Amino acid sequence: FAVRRRAKHLAQRLENVNSASDPLCALDWINAWAFAVGEENACGGRVVTSPTNGAAGVIPAVLRYYRTFIQGASPEGIREFLLTAGAIGLLYKSNASISGAEVGCQAKWVLLARWPPVRWLQFWAHPRQVENAAEIGMEHCLGLTCDPVAGQVQIPCIERNAVAAVKAVNAARLALAGDGSHFVSLDAVMQTMFETGKDMQSKYRETSRGGLAVNIVEC
């Protein structure tokens, strides 16, 4: 059972696209970069766990987006991005879970909670906006099952990296568009994620005994 690689062909096509004439070109590049990491992991290549191998495409895709499309991107912004994303990941690891086998695939996308880099949109994000971005990212992943087809980290995992990376950028932009005030706190969504995962049947928690894993014909 194998999935055809798509990242290289997508990147080659995008190299011939005038990004100024296509406002969604940046999203296509995010998809390509996330695909590349997901595909490398699926074929047994070397990737950096963040927070799992199956979700390792999100951070590099968003970082590459920052370096490529954000005016004034800097090494300082990258460091702050990684430090803050790591800190939020530790909050989830300490107070909930980052394990798909424990609480489903929602746990793997905790780093949708990310710091808008320092020069993103030309101003500093307030800590409340950082927390808001983290909350938005997880709130809309609640209940996400982990049901890999054939037990391989390919379907839906590779595409899910791309979807999550785009969602991470959007969560940051939504948070930056506000003043940081919001009804749902990060603590509340973290607790909800953990409780939701514990309520999931085991067939939806990385066992490949339910969901897509049993409804896709492997031939």
What are these model-derived regions, one by one?
Residues 12-20, 66-70, 93-97, 112-119, ...:
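Short, charged low-complexity intrinsically disordered segments located at boundaries
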Residues 120-219:
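Functionally critical mobile loop/hinge segments
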Residues 95-105, 129-133, 144:
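A beta-strand-loop signature enriched in Asp, Gly, Thr, and Trp
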Residues 9, 47, 53-56, 98, ...:
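A generic structural micro-environment signature
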Residues 32, 36, 57-67, 83-91, ...:
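Contiguous, well-ordered alpha-helical segments that form the cores/surfaces of helical PPI scaffolds
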Residues 23, 27-34, 52-55, 59, ...:
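Generic structural signal for well-ordered, non-membrane alpha-helical segments
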Residues 1-104, 211-219:
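Accessory "access/gating" subregions that flank catalytic or transport cores
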